[in-house]
Regions:
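Charged, often low-complexity linker/regulatory segments
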Residues: 1-49, 187-222
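Short, charged/polar micro-motifs that form catalytic or ligand-binding hotspots
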Residues: 9, 13, 63, 100-107
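Secondary-structure boundary elements
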Residues: 29, 33-34, 80-82, 123
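Active-site metal-binding core of divalent-cation-utilizing nuclease and nuclease-like domains
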Residues: 36-90, 106
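Short, flexible loop/turn elements at secondary-structure junctions
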Residues: 77, 95-98, 131
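Mg2+/Mn2+-dependent nuclease catalytic core
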Residues: 82-122
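Nucleic-acid nuclease catalytic cores
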Residues: 103-107, 115-171
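Non-catalytic C-terminal interaction segments of nucleic acid-processing enzymes
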Residues: 145-222
Length: 222
């Protein structure tokens, strides 16, 4: 997916659930076209606290599971580095900003959710902020610069992507953070391939056990 891409979908009256569905469909379509060589699977709206999740955990491991959470988009890549094994499992939290949301949502919204994903054993963590067409670019730059400073200041291993939907007639995106970025999924994969950008809690055995459970639920065979 790149910032000049377009879709047949209109973004009139776009809501966050619809945005997630559109992004999922675009990524899946590009995967089917062979545009992302290391991408093996895409999932969306995955609840990590279902009965199936809890039952498998209680059967194989001890200790409580974290509270309920849902991941907007999950990307599963083949990991050429094999840092843990052949799979690289990434989580994406997506937040949509309409003009009305600017007075309701904090600039850092979604960051706490991404950090929560880390304790479930994801290899990669990512936050996407998507801004509606009517929001001025100086406002977007103020939001994204502040979030980037927060992430870099604390050296959080989170890939932050901020884009604006160009217009309401097609799904065309302009990237603000990282600047002039194209081919988002490939950049995401490259970022997560670097071992120091991986999820730090994976050094703990308990988190790796949760990752094994995650692989089972997502049907990752490697």
């Amino acid at each position: 997916m790149r910032d000049t891409n377009s879709s047949k979908y209109s973004v009139t009256d776009l809501t966050e659930p619809r945005l997630i569905k559109k992004l999922y469909e675009l990524i899946l379509k590009e995967k089917e076209l062979g545009k992302h060589g290391w991408l093996r699977n895409v999932d969306k709206n995955k609840n990590l606290s279902t009965k199936e999740f809890k039952d498998i955990w209680s059967e194989w491991w001890k200790g409580p599971l974290p509270p309920s959470t849902e991941v907007d988009i999950i990307l599963i890549f083949e990991d050429p580095m094999e840092v843990i094994d052949k799979a690289l499992i990434g989580s994406i939290e997506t937040e949509y900003f309409s003009r009305g949301d600017l007075n309701k949502k904090n600039f850092y919204v979604g960051l706490q959710q991404v950090l929560a994903f880390s304790i479930f054993g994801f290899d990669g963590l990512s936050l996407w902020h998507v801004f509606s067409p009517e929001i001025e670019e100086n406002v977007i730059e103020n939001y994204t610069t502040t979030v980037s400073e927060l992430i870099s200041g604390f050296k959080l291993p989170i890939f932050y992507l901020a884009v604006k939907i160009q217009n309401k007639e097609d799904f065309r995106l302009k990237c603000f953070e990282p600047a002039k970025l194209e081919y988002y999924i490939d950049w995401l994969n490259n970022y997560w391939t670097v071992e120091t950008n991986r999820n730090p809690p994976l050094q703990r055995n308990e988190i790796r056990n949760r990752r094994n459970l995650l692989k089972t639920i997502l049907k990752v065979p490697v």
